Design a protein with these regions (language model features):
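Active-site lining segments of carbohydrate-active enzymes
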Residues: 214
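N-terminal secretory signal peptides
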Residues: 1-24, 33-42, 49
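Peptidoglycan-targeting cell-wall enzymes and recognition modules
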Residues: 57, 65-78, 111-176, 180-185
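Export/targeting segments at the very N-terminus of extracytoplasmic proteins
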Residues: 58, 63-108, 112, 209
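Extracytoplasmic/secreted envelope proteins and their assembly/folding machinery
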Residues: 80-87, 100-103, 146-153, 177-180, ...
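C-terminal segment of N-terminal export signals and the immediately downstream linker at the start
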Residues: 43-58
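A charged, solvent-exposed segment within the mature domains of Sec-exported extracytoplasmic proteins
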Residues: 171-211
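Sec/Tat-exported extracytoplasmic proteins
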Residues: 90-97, 107-117, 152-160, 187-191, ...
Length: 215
């Protein structure tokens, strides 16, 4: 089993490129492909009950999540909740499924679908590893799930960076991975396309069960 350190980044002068010895995402979080089931199981601990069907609380939105690893067949409760919340927020905005798919693949690649707390690439954090220094809001904003999702979509008031709906106004006509790359400007753009199937599987599992979140 790979050690946890093998998934962590080495900083670059640009703050975006990953260590040459480990194929990581733009902000150094996601190893190529998916993390093995054994690795994921060893890292996951008991998770709280699902928030689905309940109020999405402020505690949920700001929960510090430092777990690592993603396997579509072994998502833990936090990953399920976060995926459901992304779907709920996109539904609440009345957005098409293509937008939700791009949002999900970006969160899978950037943070393993966790509200990742530690700053990995200089000042990055949260579901999308957004950087305050790049106009995505404050350090607290990028670690607040609703604010981070809205900022990624380009619908929040806390971000000056162009979000998905500004950068790719005709999302449905784009290849999902390319749409994600247009927002994220990754040093490893191929990573997004690799997670399209996972995002669509998540949509198939949960979309019909999740109510729109409009708060």
């Amino acid at each position: 089993m790979s050690s946890l350190s093998s998934f962590l980044p080495a900083s670059s002068s640009a703050g975006r490129s990953a260590a040459a010895s480990a194929p990581l995402s733009r902000r150094g979080l996601f190893a190529a492909g998916t993390v093995g089931l054994a690795s994921l199981t060893s890292l996951a601990v008991a998770a709280p009950a699902s928030a689905q069907g309940e109020t999405w609380t402020e505690a949920f939105m700001t929960r510090e999540e430092t777990r690592e690893g993603f396997e579509i067949g072994a998502m833990d409760q936090w990953q399920v909740e976060n995926a459901q919340f992304i779907i709920a927020v996109c539904k609440g905005h009345g957005l098409e499924e293509a937008v939700t798919t791009v949002t999900l693949i970006t969160a899978i690649v950037e943070s393993w679908l966790y509200n990742y707390e530690p700053a990995v690439d200089l000042d990055s954090g949260g579901l999308f590893q957004q950087r305050p220094s790049m106009g995505w809001g404050s350090a607290a904003d990028v670690r607040h799930k609703k604010k981070a999702i809205d900022a990624f979509l380009g619908l929040g008031e806390i971000s000056s960076a162009p979000g998905l709906l500004q950068a790719v106004p005709d999302v449905a006509s784009w290849e999902p991975g390319q749409a994600a790359q247009t927002v994220q400007a990754s040093a490893h753009p191929e990573r997004y396309a690799e997670q399209v199937t996972s995002a669509r599987t998540i949509m198939d599992r949960y979309s019909r069960k999740v109510a729109p979140f409009t708060a």
